[in-house]
Curated annotation (Swiss-Prot):
GO terms for cellular component: plasma membrane-derived thylakoid membrane; proton-transporting ATP synthase complex. The gene is atpD. This is ATP synthase subunit beta. It catalyses: ATP + H2O + 4 H(+)(in) = ADP + phosphate + 5 H(+)(out). HAMAP family: ATP_synth_beta_bact.
Amino acid sequence: MVATTEQTVGKITQVIGPVVDAEFPSGKLPRIYNALTVKGTNPAGAEVNITCEVQQLLGDNQVRAVAMSSTDGLVRGMEIIDTGAPISVPVGKSTLGRIFNVLGEPVDEKGSVNVNETFPIHRPAPKLTDLETKPKVFETGIKVIDLLTPYRQGGKIGLFGGAGVGKTVIMMELINNIAIQHGGVSVFGGVGERTREGNDLYNEMIESKVINPDNPEDSKIALVYGQMNEPPGARMRVGLSALTMAEYFRDVNKQDVLLFIDNIFRFVQAGSEVSALLGRMPSAVGYQPTLGTDVGDLQERITSTKEGSITSIQAVYVPADDLTDPAPATTFAHLDGTTVLSRGLASKGIYPAVDPLDSTSTMLQPNIVGQEHYKTARAVQSTLQRYKELQDIIAILGLDELSEEDRQTVDRARKIERFLSQPFFVAEVFTGSPGKYVTLEDTIKGFNMILNGELDDLPEQAFYMVGNIDEAIAKAEKLKKG
């Protein structure tokens, strides 16, 4: 049903924190999810401009709404206007290179946005008949991901990792590669994270040329932020605002889109705060009773259609490292793969620090990726697993005490570990090494050559921070000549 755009005026009857109750004329009640606005001056002479979203119809012509910004300055009796439609955000090329809040207002002090079209943030998921059901691998050009945890086009990937292990750099490299190789764009939803991190990310994107501040429409990404200091209503809806911008690129521009959500746990946390404010009975561990529905409403819209795809990378915070907590447990049910970043690898200087043994993907099946890819990936994992098992023996007794076969395994595993590292385009400014995009074919060929013993005579440092295997061979020649 299409919402009418007829505007009705009501009166505020109660304000408790971010929750606003209002009374409307009989027969003219706003619908659930309609946006209500309060504009003007309050009796104290303070300017007020607040948008709320209707959550409950209370009876007696009363509605309960949740504010998207601070309710400071609101008083009982003020006029509140029903806009007749849900919150809508700008969509299209004009959003690229800009930072928006949950309402689609630019917050980067770069002036207004030339808005030709807006979309409501509450939209149905694509119909089953419109979905692309054949699983298709999304090539990222990053060796460790393409070989061991291949991403599904239109899939959802959880990105797990602590501070300083390289989540942001991987995100920026993916943004860069989808723009160059797939002609796609990206949308970043900053949900309930630190304002400083949002600012750092924006500046890093300018530095690595993902955002062009002089001509924003040449940028490869749109950013939507609802940071930690925002009211729970904004943090709960900012993910939907980002997703709506991504849906336009998929459905109207027919592009492949990357959607980053950082952090999906904060989305659930905000929903739980709103649920308590609305007086709902909490369920397990204090979460909202509608946890499954809330997460499902967001995740079901992230998918591949016959026109284009939205592939989503979601940073997942695990509270107290408890994977059975309802928030991460509900999220896991929707994920097609997990990319786990390891502090141990980062401390060795191996970047991207993706853990090859802990990371998983539902796409790593012979009937999807092919027999050769599957066998190579499994052989790489078993070699690394054996190396991990032998590390205690090596630490106590040294390499010389190992059997000939185990020594060979260790030698190849160390080469594999180094070959899983790769110079990134977005890190060129820091490393001084030109970035490399490695095709899946080259990746499989390289690892097969290491596993088959064809490169046993090359030094292991030749495999560190190179693109394909030919570069490793050339680097070995260079090292030989000194």
